[in-house]
């Protein structure tokens, strides 16, 4: 596998997957790397579009400015990974461990994060439109300024989740417990999609009628 043009000169783009490997700005698209040990790997700017990374060990890895568009990362360990400004269009993180990961300004449009563990993750100003968080753990996560338009939060956990200025246009909140979330205001709910089972923080009232139905 050759490095991308302009890739960092010392990056070992042809090196085999290994803990701490340097794949900075390398092209690793459409490969099969399921279960690979990439713990602490240096992969800033690297491309993994369409790559199979299911069950990969990527704890503490650096994928800043990287790309995982349509990649499969189900069950991967990305705990404490640096994923700042990561591109992940339609990427699958189902059941992945993203505990404490830094996803600041990442673009995860239509990503599947169902049943993922995002506890204490940093998702500030992250693009999460139409992302699926069904059954995800977002306890203690920071979603300040994130765009969750039309995202699905059904069955997600949001204990201590910071939702300050989070955009929630048509966000699915059916049956979601937001009672211990932080920074939520009534104006965000006026454009969201909840139901009678949606629990809100003390002092915040639900809209008289939620603005959308289950088919939206």
Describe each region flagged by the PLM.
Residues 1-6:
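Bacterial N-terminal signal peptides
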Residues 9-216:
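Tandem repeat scaffolds
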């Amino acid at each position: 596998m050759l490095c991308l043009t302009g890739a960092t000169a010392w990056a070992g783009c042809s090196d085999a997957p290994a803990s701490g490997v340097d794949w900075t700005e390398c092209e690793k698209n459409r490969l099969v790397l399921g279960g690979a040990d990439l713990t602490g790997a240096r992969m800033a700017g690297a491309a993994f579009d369409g790559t199979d990374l299911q069950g990969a060990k990527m704890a503490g890895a650096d994928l800043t400015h990287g790309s995982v568009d349509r990649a499969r990362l189900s069950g991967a360990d990305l705990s404490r990974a640096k994923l700042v400004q990561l591109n992940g269009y339609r990427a699958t993180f189902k059941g992945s461990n993203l505990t404490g990961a830094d996803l600041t300004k990442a673009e995860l449009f239509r990503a599947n994060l169902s049943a993922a563990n995002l506890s204490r993750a940093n998702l500030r100003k992250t693009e999460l439109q139409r992302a699926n968080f069904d059954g995800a753990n977002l306890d203690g996560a920071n979603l300040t300024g994130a765009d969750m338009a039309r995202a699905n939060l059904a069955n997600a956990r949001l204990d201590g989740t910071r939702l300050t200025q989070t955009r929630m246009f048509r966000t699915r909140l059916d049956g979601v417990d937001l009672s211990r979330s932080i920074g939520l205001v009534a104006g965000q709910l006026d454009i969201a999609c909840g139901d009678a089972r949606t629990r809100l923080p003390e002092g915040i009232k639900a809209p008289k009628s939620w603005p959308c139905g289950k088919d939206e």
